[in-house]
Amino acid sequence: MAVKKKVSWRSLIVGCLGDPETLMASSKKPKRKNDVIKKQSSFQRLSILDMSNPSSNTLSEDLSISLAGSDLHVFTLAELKVITQSFSSTNFLGEGGFGPVHKGFIDDKLRPGLKAQPVAVKLLDLEGLQGHREWLTEVMFLGQLKHKNLVKLIGYCCEEEHRTLVYEFMPRGSLENQLFRRYSASLPWSTRMKIAHGAATGLQFLHEAENPVIYRDFKASNILLDSDYTAKLSDFGLAKDGPEGDDTHVSTRVMGTQGYAAPEYIMTGHLTARSDVYSFGVVLLELLTGRRSVDKKRSSREQNLVDWARPMLNDPRKLSRIMDPRLEGQYSETGARKAATLAYQCLSHRPKNRPCMSAVVSILNDLKDYNDIPMGTFTYTVPNTPDNKEDDGRVGNKPRKSSHHHHHQQQQSNHPRSSPSPTTKSPSPTAKSPRNSTENHRRTLRNGVNSPLRSEAGGERY
């Protein structure tokens, strides 16, 4: 729960990349005398750091200085080859905007002080500067922020042109994978509320840190789950320092994922902690309904989840229409009503009307303990209609690729239930199961780090 005092990474990022977002925003503000002095001093530091060239000989040294006191390990490429068996295809987990991800295992003999453990090794594709910036941002944030609901960054490699990140391995993969895989066992109500509470706690920690952080890319595929379904936020490539002093927001280029980004952020580029609250409301709505934030396979009026479901969230008589049918009625009605009301508030078009994350965490903490869940055994059959056919992990005639670290190879899910487990009919032995198909492990949930507003599950880019 403790956070190590952050050295300011802002000057480091600016030195590395020229930070066009921040520079553009600051140019719009009235220049005060003190501002000019500070900027001159800042630019003197930039010329020293000057990490705009990813192959800079001083990059590794600058990072080591900036992250002094952190417990990050700086791996060599040779060590990573040992950990991943030379990046063997048998250890391949997936590939996304950052590049391929491999599972690995750190032996306790690799180096003193590093315990034996499974890891996920993400290799960055450095063809574009954008990727380097996200890699650097992730190292800086996760190197200094420590919390049980943030994924642990164990270390990194910055050797010649190679850029890698080494994370703790998350055996349950992402919430996106657990919630939307067609043939996976349905997440029970209690587990969904546990995940929502954990993810909300992670956001609260970021917003209330000594130097507040705006996550900016909160979505189901960025919520990773350990073996006990503890939620941990991952992928800090788009994270930003919160507003400073009397500023009410951060002005920045619009980036994120369609269906999750707050409407005022899309319209104005003004980013606040309440922008994250809106995104949380979308994920909470996904947990309630079992639907994606954007689903082009549905009818036109139901493709955007928020537009379709939000009007019904505040009406108890209509709530049952939007609840995930795979829950088969086994959820707390009182808890569902309170969760729906919370989602409604988080999704307000007026940022000031959204609750802060501490209030969200408090409400969800109570919801975890509701035990008025109906008992009984049910069978839910997936309708075999054209609208519900799985797309076999393909977009057009091309197979999708799996998201990077978010989609670790999945273990068989045995979800804990607070009531007898309903039986879900399995596909016939002759049917092709997406779980076992190669394409299923190569889905791309991020359409590239260079997209201003990335699409999710087939959504349109802005």
UniProtKB/Swiss-Prot annotation:
PROSITE patterns: PROTEIN_KINASE_DOM, PROTEIN_KINASE_ST. Autophosphorylated. Autophosphorylation is reduced in presence of the Xanthomonas campestris effector XopAC/AvrAC. Uridylylated at Ser-251 and Thr-252 by the Xanthomonas campestris effector XopAC/AvrAC. This conceals conserved phosphorylation sites in the activation loop, reducing RIPK kinase activity and consequently inhibiting downstream signaling. PANTHER family: OS01G0588500 PROTEIN-RELATED. GO terms for molecular function: ATP binding; protein serine kinase activity; protein serine/threonine kinase activity. Residues 378-462 are annotated as: Disordered. Keywords: ATP-binding, Cell membrane, Hypersensitive response elicitation, Kinase, Membrane, Nucleotide-binding, Phosphoprotein, Plant defense, Serine/threonine-protein kinase, Transferase. GO terms for biological process: defense response to bacterium; protein phosphorylation. Induction: Induced by the microbe-associated molecular pattern (MAMP) flagellin (flg22). Induced by the Pseudomonas syringae effectors AvrB and AvrRpm1. Induced by 12-oxo-phytodienoic acid (OPDA). Down-regulated by UV-B. Residues 410-435 have a biased composition (Low complexity). Belongs to the protein kinase superfamily. Ser/Thr protein kinase family. The modification Phosphothreonine is found at residues 76, 252, 257. Disruption phenotype: Reduced leaf width. Enhanced disease resistance to the bacterial pathogen Pseudomonas syringae pv. tomato. Compromised pathogen-associated molecular pattern (PAMP, e.g. flg22)-induced oxidative burst. Mitigation of the higher virulence of EPD1-deficient V.dahliae. The modification Phosphoserine is found at residues 221, 251. Residues 397-409 have a biased composition (Basic residues). One of its GO terms (cellular component) is plasma membrane. Pfam families: PK_Tyr_Ser-Thr. This is Serine/threonine-protein kinase RIPK. It catalyses: L-seryl-[protein] + ATP = O-phospho-L-seryl-[protein] + ADP + H(+); L-threonyl-[protein] + ATP = O-phospho-L-threonyl-[protein] + ADP + H(+). The modification O-UMP-threonine is found at residue 252. Its EC number is 2.7.11.1. The active site is at residue 217. The modification O-UMP-serine is found at residue 251. Serine/threonine-protein kinase involved in disease resistance. During Pseudomonas syringae infection, and in response to the bacterial effectors AvrB and AvrRpm1, RIPK phosphorylates the host target RIN4, which subsequently activates RPM1-dependent effector-triggered immunity (ETI). Seems to act as negative regulator of plant basal defense responses. May play a role in pathogen-associated molecular pattern (PAMP, e.g. chitin and flg22)-triggered immunity (PTI). Required for the bacterial XopAC/AvrAC effector-triggered immunity against Xanthomonas campestris.
